[in-house]
Amino acid sequence: MNLKISFLKSKYILAIVSLTTFLSANETNHIETIYLGSGCFWGAEKGYESLNGVIDAESGYANGYGVKPNYRSIIQFKNKYNENNFAEVVKVTFNSNAISLEDILKHFFETHDPTQLNRQGNDIGTQYR
């Protein structure tokens, strides 16, 4: 009797795992990533995370060298206008079945001014390019 119960439990667990694996594999076929620099990454990250279909938004740094890619190094006064400074960016991971790249880019252009060089509003420095 114990063996049969154990077998039935295993059978159901296997069925659930298989269904979950199938759904997860199907959903991940539509996972895409884009890196966007739209000024200070803290506010940008929060804005992207609020969009339905965005799975994750993660702050980071891109396109620099000669400066340590960490917050303290990047915001130092000596790096404020350093052309080699890293830019603050957000890595946006999204499900393209739930939100289009066009919608993400629409949000991108609505929330920052691409005509401002090395600044976004009151934030000034090459990290905001």
Task: Specify the residue positions occupied by each region the protein language model found.
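Bacterial N-terminal signal peptides
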Residues: 10-21
